[in-house]
Swiss-Prot record:
It comes from Symbiobacterium thermophilum (strain DSM 24528 / JCM 14929 / IAM 14863 / T). Predicted to be exported by the Tat system. The position of the signal peptide cleavage has not been experimentally proven. Mo-bis(molybdopterin guanine dinucleotide) binds at residues 83, 144, 169, 173, 256-258, 341, 345, 451, 497, 524, 642-651, 728, 745. Component of the nitrate reductase NapAB complex composed of NapA and NapB. This is Nitrate reductase. Keywords: 4Fe-4S, Electron transport, Iron, Iron-sulfur, Metal-binding, Molybdenum, Nitrate assimilation, Oxidoreductase, Secreted, Signal, Transport. The gene is napA.
Length: 754
C-alpha cells in the first residue's frame, strides 16, 4: 500500500480519522514484537499532553520493547494517539540524545565529568549570589518536570537561595487559566473532570483544536456524540479545523474578538430568560474593574454586546450568535465548555476565562455531571508540578503566595528553613526573566526540561538574552536552547526515572521507572540535589533519599484546609490515579469540587459552596472587549496565529526522533486562505516569507488541506526547528496584565511569495 498521510493516520488509530470514517475508536494494541516475551510491564503515564493517558511499558534487558494503552486507566481506557503509540521510539534512540555532561570551552560544547560540570555550575551561581544578591540567579522549569523535581527546585531557589525568580513554561500556556480560576472561584483547577464528557448534551469548544491537541479527549467527545441522544457541538474558532467536521454550529469569528462574542452569549441568555436567578442569588456576586456591581448593572453592561452590536465586531451574523447562545443556555440540557491556548495565549486571556465561567454561573450549569467549564492543559504535569507545586514566581506550594507572610512561614516550616530568608517580593515573570538575563540583572540561569530558545515569543530578543547570561540546561535531547548553553546536563527521560504527574482533571498519577538512563544521564532530582549540596545547602536536602520521601514531604504542604489533599505515594503506585482532594472523608478522591457530599471542604447544608472565596460565592465579571495588542494595518495586513498538528508536540525535541511521525506528518507549513493565496500569486507548496515587526521566517504554503483559516488570517505551525522557520521570530511578547501570559495567538504579519 502506498504510504500516505491518510494511511498513516488510519494505521495509527487516530480517533479523528476513525470518526471521519464513521467507526468508533478502539484501544490501540501494542505493536507485534516477539521481544515482549519475558518482558516486564510497568504502569506509567504518557509523556506528552495534559490528558494524562495511562501507558503500559514493556522492558527487557534494560530496553523498552513495547508500549500500549492502559485499558485500566479511566482517562484513555486503552486508547493512545500517534505520539503515545510511538513512545518506545524516543526511549530507544540515541539520535540527538545527550549522553554526557557538556561544558563550553573555546566556544564549543565539550564532554566533561559530572563533578567538573556540577562544580562549575555551583561556582558560577555562588559567585553571582555573593556578588550581586539572590535575585541575580533564576530557574526556568517545565510542566514536563515531575512534581518532585519542581518541589526540589522551588525549595533550593525560594527557600535556600532566597529568590522568587522561579518560573516555568506553564506561564506560556496556563497562566491565564490560573488567573481565571483564582479571580472567579478563589482556587485554581477545575471543579469538574473528564467524566463530564459522557454526561454532556452540548459541547461548546472555543480556542481549542481538540482533535489535534487533545485527541483522546476528542475521541471521547465524538463517541458521546455518536452514542448519545441529540448531542450537539458548537465550535467557535477563527480557523476551520478538524473539530468543525462534527460541529452543529461553527462560528468563525474574527481573530481577537471572542470576548465580545462571549459577552453576546451572556446577553442573549439573560434577555431570553435562560439564566437561573435562584442560582445567581445564592452562589454568585458581580464585579467590574472597579469593584462590586449589581446584577442590574451587569445587565446594563451587556447592552453594548447584543448580537446586532457584536456581529460587525466578530464578522458573524446575529442569528448565528443567538443560535449558539440558546444552545449553550438551553434548559434541561447539560453544557460542557472546553478551551485551551486560543483563549489563554492572549492579552485578555484572564478576562476570557472569566467570561466563559460567566456563562456557566449565569445558567447554573456548573458543579454537576456534564455541566462543566473545563480548562484543557497542554503539558503532562503543568497542573501537578508547577501549578500545585508553586513553580512560578508568585507562587508557593498548594495555592500559597510568596507575598503572604503566613504562607511563607507555613512553607518554611515544612522545608526546615528560616522563613526570613524567603523573599516577599514576586520574582520575574517569564518574559521579564529573559529580559533580565539579557540586560545583566540575571547573571546565571538554570533551565530544566524546556526549550525557550525555540518556544518563547519575540525569539530574536530571547536568544540574544540567552547568549549574555551564564546558561545551564538540563535536558534529555539537544535542542535550540542547549546550543546556546554554557553547561548542558544530561537528564533521564520518561521511564528512566519514577515520579508523579498531575493531569488536567486534578488526577495525580505515578510513573514507574522501567529502564536505566542512557549514557551518563541522571534524574533531574539527582542533579538538583547535587547542585544544592555544592552551593552549601546540603543540610536541607540530605534526607531526600527517594522520590517517595520528597512526595511525602510535599503532602504536608496540603491538608489543613488548603483543599490540596493528596494520598500517600504508595497508593499512586498501585492505582490509576486519584483526583484531589483525597483525605479521610474522601479516600477515593473528589469527583466534583465545591459540591456537598463529594468535596470534603463544603460545609454541611451548603449544597454548592465556592470556598476559595470568603463568602463562598463565585464572581461574575463584566469584562469589556479589547483589541489584541497588535492588529493588521497597511504594512502588516494579515493576522497571524500559531499552533500545532496532531502528530507533533511543542518544539519537536522528542517527536522528530520518530521516523514514522516525521514521514507521516510531512512538511511543516503555513496555512493561507485560497483567495488570499490567489491574490498574492501563491500556490500550494510554494515558499512564502512572513514578516512581523519582530522578525521574519519562511514557510511552505498550504492552500486547502486539513484546516482552512479565514480570509486575512494565516496559521503557522509552531514545531519547525530550522532557524529560518522558527515561528516565534514573528510572535508578540505582549502579556496579559494579570497573568503575564504572552499573546502567541494574534499578531500582524506581511505575507509574500519567497
Amino acid at each position: 500500500m502506498k504510504f500516505t498521510r491518510r494511511s498513516f493516520v488510519k494505521a495509527s488509530a487516530l480517533a479523528t480519522a476513525m470518526v471521519a470514517a464513521g467507526c468508533s475508536p478502539q484501544p490501540v494494541a501494542p505493536k507485534q514484537n516477539p521481544e515482549t516475551e519475558g518482558a516486564t510491564w510497568y504502569k506509567t503515564v504518557c509523556r506528552y499532553c495534559g490528558v494524562g493517558c495511562g501507558v503500559m511499558v514493556a522492558a527487557k534487558d534494560n530496553r523498552v520493547v513495547a508500549v500500549k494503552g492502559d485499558t485500566e486507566n479511566p482517562v484513555n481506557k486503552g486508547l493512545l494517539c500517534v505520539k503515545g503509540y510511538y513512545l518506545d521510539r524516543i526511549m530507544n534512540t540515541e539520535e540527538g540524545r545527550i549522553l554526557k555532561p557538556l561544558i563550553r570551552k573555546n566556544g564549543q560544547l565539550t564532554e566533561a565529568s559530572w563533578d567538573e560540570a556540577l562544580d562549575l555550575v555551583a561556582a558560577r551561581f555562588r559567585e553571582a549570589i555573593d556578588q550581586h544578591g539572590p535575585d541575580s540567579v533564576g530557574f526556568y522549569g517545565s510542566g514536563q518536570n515531575l512534581a518532585e523535581e519542581t518541589y526540589i527546585a522551588n525549595k533550593l531557589f525560594k527557600g535556600c537561595i532566597g529568590t522568587n525568580n522561579v518560573e516555568g513554561n506553564p506561564r506560556t500556556c496556563m497562566a491565564s487559566a490560573v488567573a481565571g480560576f483564582l479571580s472567579t472561584f478563589g482556587k485554581d483547577e477545575p471543579m469538574g473532570n473528564l467524566d463530564d464528557i459522557e454526561h454532556a448534551d452540548t459541547f461548546f469548544i472555543i480556542g481549542s483544536n481538540t482533535a489535534e491537541a487533545h485527541p483522546i479527549i476528542y475521541s471521547r467527545i465524538t463517541t458521546r456524540k455518536q452514542t448519545g441522544k441529540d448531542v450537539k457541538v458548537i465550535l467557535a474558532d477563527p480557523r476551520r479545523h478538524r473539530v468543525a467536521d462534527i460541529a452543529d454550529i461553527f462560528l468563525p469569528f474574527r481573530p481577537g474578538t471572542d470576548l465580545a462574542l462571549l459577552n453576546a452569549f451572556a446577553q442573549v441568555i439573560i434577555e431570553e430568560g435562560l439564566h437561573d436567578p435562584d442560582f445567581i442569588e445564592r452562589h454568585t456576586t458581580f464585579q467590574d474593574g472597579n469593584g462590586a456591581i449589581t446584577f442590574e448593572q451587569y445587565v446594563a453592561f451587556l447592552q453594548d454586546y447584543t448580537p446586532e452590536k457584536v456581529a460587525p465586531i466578530t464578522g458573524l451574523s446575529p442569528d448565528d450568535i443567538r443560535a449558539a447562545a440558546r444552545e449553550i443556555g438551553a434548559r434541561g440540557r447539560k453544557t460542557m465548555t472546553l478551551w485551551c491556548m486560543g483563549i489563554n495565549q492572549r492579552t485578555v486571556g484572564t478576562w476570557l476565562n472569566n467570561a466563559i465561567y460567566n456563562l456557566h454561573l449565569l445558567t447554573g450549569k456548573i458543579c454537576q455531571p456534564g455541566n462543566s467549564p473545563f480548562s484543557l492543559t497542554g503539558q503532562p504535569s503543568a497542573c501537578g508540578s508547577v501549578r500545585e507545586g508553586g513553580g512560578l514566581s508568585h507562587l508557593l506550594p498548594c495555592g500559597r503566595q510568596v507575598t503572604n507572610e503566613q504562607h511563607r512561614k507555613e512553607v518554611a516550616a515544612v522545608w526546615g528553613v528560616d522563613y526570613t530568608r524567603m523573599s516577599d517580593k514576586v520574582g520575574y515573570h517569564t518574559m521579564e526573566m529573559f529580559r533580565a538575563a539579557g540586560d545583566g540583572r540575571i547573571k546565571a540561569l538554570l533551565i530544566s526540561c524546556t526549550n525557550p530558545g525555540h518556544s518563547l515569543p519575540n525569539l530574536n530578543s530571547v536568544r540574544a538574552s540567552l547568549e549574555k547570561t551564564f546558561l545551564v540546561v538540563m535536558d534529555a535531547f539537544h535542542n535550540r536552547t542547549t546550543e546556546l548553553a554554557d553547561v548542558v546536563l544530561p537528564s533521564a527521560l520518561w521511564c528512566e526515572k519514577e515520579g508523579i504527574y498531575g493531569n488536567t482533571e486534578r488526577r495525580t498519577q505515578h510513573l514507574a521507572k522501567a529502564v536505566e538512563p542512557k549514557g551518563e544521564a541522571r534524574p533531574d532530582v539527582w542533579i538538583l540535589l547535587e547542585i544544592a549540596k555544592r552551593l552549601g545547602y546540603g543540610e536541607y536536602f540530605s534526607h531526600y533519599t527517594s522520590n517517595e520521601v520528597i512526595w511525602e514531604e510535599f503532602r504536608k504542604m496540603g491538608g489543613g484546609g488548603t483543599g490540596y489533599d493528596y494520598a500517600p505515594y504508595e497508593r499512586y503506585k498501585q492505582e490509576r490515579g486519584l483526583r484531589w482532594p483525597v483525605n479521610d472523608k474522601q479516600p477515593a478522591g473528589t469527583t466534583l469540587r465545591y459540591v456537598e457530599g463529594d468535596d470534603p471542604f463544603v460545609p454541611e447544608g451548603a449544597g454548592i459552596y465556592f470556598y476559595g472565596k470568603p463568602d463562598g460565592k463565585a464572581v461574575i465579571y463584566a469584562r469589556p472587549h479589547r483589541d489584541p495588542a497588535e492588529v493588521p494595518d497597511a504594512e502588516y495586513p494579515f493576522y497571524l496565529s500559531t499552533g500545532r498538528i496532531l502528530e507533533h508536540w511543542h518544539t519537536i525535541t522528542m517527536t522528530k526522533r520518530v521516523p514514522e511521525i516525521m514521514k507521516g506528518a510531512g512538511e511543516f507549513y503555513c496555512e493561507i486562505h485560497e483567495e488570499d493565496a490567489a491574490r498574492l500569486g501563491i500556490q500550494n507548496g510554494d515558499l512564502v516569507k512572513l514578516t512581523s515587526r519582530r522578525g521574519q521566517v519562511v514557510a511552505t504554503a498550504r492552500v486547502g488541506g486539513r484546516a482552512v483559516p479565514q480570509k486575512g488570517l494565516v496559521f503557522l505551525l509552531m514545531h519547525d526547528d530550522r532557524t529560518e522557520r522558527l515561528a516565534n521570530f514573528l510572535t508578540n511578547d505582549a502579556v496579559d496584565e494579570t497573568s503575564k501570559q504572552m499573546e502567541y495567538k494574534v499578531c500582524a504579519v506581511r505575507v509574500e511569495k519567497a
